[in-house]
């Protein structure tokens, strides 16, 4: 069951892409969550995590990324590149479905 609000997580991975931690970044409203790159990457820096996967759910049930989702992902990919932390994917969950920026081939399009 999906939450009635957007909740954004960053999954921290080790050098072999094994999960080493989960960071609750933001709990938003029914249509958005405020995602500050510093809050995404600070726990990853502390954990010496070289890569993260971001994920959040759309309470509407439609996993299609919004313009805000695309912009947020681009900012996170760019910030991660500066910090040396790869953003491997941003997965949006919906009602029994998901959207993966990496699977769609648009994650690397966010790089300058």
Predicted regions and their residues:
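Active-site-proximal loop/helix of nucleotide/amide-processing enzymes and allied scaffolds
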Residues: 12-16, 26-112
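Long amphipathic N-terminal alpha/beta scaffold segment
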Residues: 1-20
């Amino acid at each position: 069951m999906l939450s009635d609000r957007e909740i954004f997580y960053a999954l921290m991975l080790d050098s072999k892409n094994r999960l080493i931690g989960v960071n609750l970044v933001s709990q938003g409203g029914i249509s958005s969550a405020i995602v500050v790159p510093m809050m995404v990457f600070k726990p990853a820096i502390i954990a010496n995590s070289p890569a993260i996967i971001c994920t959040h759910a759309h309470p509407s049930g439609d996993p299609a990324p919004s313009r805000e989702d695309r912009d947020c992902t681009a900012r996170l990919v760019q910030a991660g590149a500066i910090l040396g932390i790869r953003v491997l994917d941003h997965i949006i969950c919906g009602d029994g479905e998901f959207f993966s920026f990496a699977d769609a081939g648009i994650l690397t399009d966010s790089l300058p």
